[in-house]
């Protein structure tokens, strides 16, 4: 009889511990990702090497140049490095324009900082479109001279191997738009 009672108590204790552990796991489950985190996850899906032409309506002599883009996830998945260069040019910052852009989540905002060859660092915040295919960045502020700076960016995902980027550069008060049509290289 005592062994049956002890066995019954043991089963009750095991069941109670199992349910308590199950409830603890439910309450410690990760919260749903924020809109900024969802947008960042979308941006990280672009990691890799890309190439394609640029179109600049305001400067036809620049149109048609083949560009190379490297997108790399770094810092344990917390940052995305975006680096443009003209295809076929060496990585020599003293001779060629190789702007670097960093993307990351800051609180509840997807943030982009563009380290420009103009010597400034515009900061933009991004939002994903309802269909999840476009992330648009709006100018927030700038470190350095605001006279010439990147002011706006739009990333549009066509499919896993094709995306476009539209960047707006401010030349004093005049916007200059550049459209990049990029195909995955790897």
Q: Which residue ranges define each predicted feature?
A:
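Hydrophobic small-molecule pocket/channel-lining residues, especially in calycin-type beta-barrels
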Residues: 21-186
């Amino acid at each position: 009889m005592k062994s049956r009672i002890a066995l019954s108590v043991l089963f009750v204790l095991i069941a109670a511990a199992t349910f308590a552990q199950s409830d603890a796991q439910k309450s410690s489950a990760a919260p749903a990702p924020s809109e900024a985190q969802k947008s960042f996850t979308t941006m990280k899906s672009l990691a890799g090497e890309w190439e394609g032409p640029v179109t600049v309506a305001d400067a036809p002599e620049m149109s048609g140049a083949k560009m190379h883009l490297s997108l790399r996830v770094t810092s344990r998945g917390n940052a995305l490095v975006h680096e443009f260069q003209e295809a076929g040019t060496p990585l020599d910052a003293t001779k060629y324009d190789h702007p670097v852009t960093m993307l990351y989540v800051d609180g509840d905002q997807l943030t982009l900082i563009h380290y420009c060859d103009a010597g400034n660092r515009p900061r933009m915040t991004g939002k994903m479109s309802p269909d999840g295919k476009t992330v648009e960045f709006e100018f927030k502020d700038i470190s350095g001279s605001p006279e010439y700076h990147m002011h706006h960016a739009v990333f549009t995902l066509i499919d896993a191997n094709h995306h476009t980027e539209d960047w707006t550069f401010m030349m004093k008060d005049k916007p200059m738009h550049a459209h990049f049509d990029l195909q995955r290289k790897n």
